[in-house]
Amino acid sequence: MIPKFLLRKTQCYHSGNLCKKKSYTELHRVLTKNHRVKFIFTFIFLLALGTASLAQQKVNWNGYMQYRFSDNYLNQTEFSVRRAKFWVNGLIPEEDGSWSYKLQANFLQQVKYQFLLQDVLVNYKINNFEVTAGQFVPDFSLQRKQPDYAIPLDERADVVNALVPGAETMARDIGVELKLDDSKTGSFSFGFFNGNGANTVSNQRNFLYVNRGSLFLLNNPESKLELGYNLSYRDAHNIQFSKIYGNNYAFTGNDFRFGFEEKLNLGAFELQSEYIEAHLGNQKAYGYYALADYLFVSKNLVTLSVEQLYDLNPSTINDPWYVVGYSYLIKGNNIKISLDNKFQFASNKTNALTTLQIQYFFN
């Protein structure tokens, strides 16, 4: 689907430079309002690399780039670097469990390709139980927890990008999360976070609480069926929800969100869907997506999807989007070429977006 920021960008071309400037600078304003925090995280990142090198521990580094061409058939035709991510991680095994860490950064086009830290975390795991602390993506929404390089389409659904709790700051927050994960029966997690996003110092005493659970109804090598739910709550104070309300709106009040999810695997066929609802005070934003894909001859992936988001911004169009996607897996997800065609049939016009993307892993 066409992300909401692209729709706002398209509308702004018809309303002058002021709106266009606001659309581009909103994420930049959110992510850079505390430069000291960015400096501290960068220092930790470099210190971790140096410490690992001095200790002669093996540090695993990884990275990938998504380079794309897109055309909305109206006023936007461009080449862009959608993502350029780099991360290091390591594992320290112990007799009664194992410690691991991860530090990940991304060059974001939306903020003029600034180098921003996304994940700074440490994890302890023993058997099926694990604890994660730091800055990372809270366990809310099936598709949001799936890596963007592994999803069958070029972008996650609008409802996921807009309604997960940390949507305004790369879906990340700072906190602690406990998780019990059994590969045969399902998983259960509970976490509490600052609640005002990534790379940001908390200025309140009210946490964001997140809970997710899933259960396998069918689980064997040939077929799997998993159902799940998501819950989150925070007492929000002056938090920007631009992906729900639009720019320059700060929300204060009860923020309660929930969702349901489903994933079915039958050999080369996969069906996945989610419904998410956000209650902000006495207002409600909600939406869904349903996605089906089939892998032909191990390298050809065909995807069909439909999604719809009802936000609280009166200037956006709420009609559903339909997607037809094709990916050629040259070397699995390590080298992949994909073509997505997205359509929205509004009351007075048809919106469309075509995206051609190449994904390449550096390591």
PLM region descriptions:
Residues Q57-G195, R205-V210, S214-P221, E226, ...:
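Outer membrane beta-barrel
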Residues T51-A55:
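Sec/Tat signal peptide C-region and signal peptidase I cleavage site
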Residues G213, Y326-I330, I335, T350-N363:
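Outer-membrane beta-barrel "beta-signal"
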Residues L215-L312:
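Detector for outer-membrane/organellar transmembrane beta-barrel domains
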Residues D293, V297-F345:
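C-terminal hydrophobic structural anchor segments
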Residues F69, A157-A162, Q240-G246, D340-K342:
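Extracytoplasmic loops and strand-loop junctions of Gram-negative outer membrane beta-barrel proteins
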Residues M1-C19, S23-F39, L46-L47:
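Short, low-complexity, charge-dense intrinsically disordered segments
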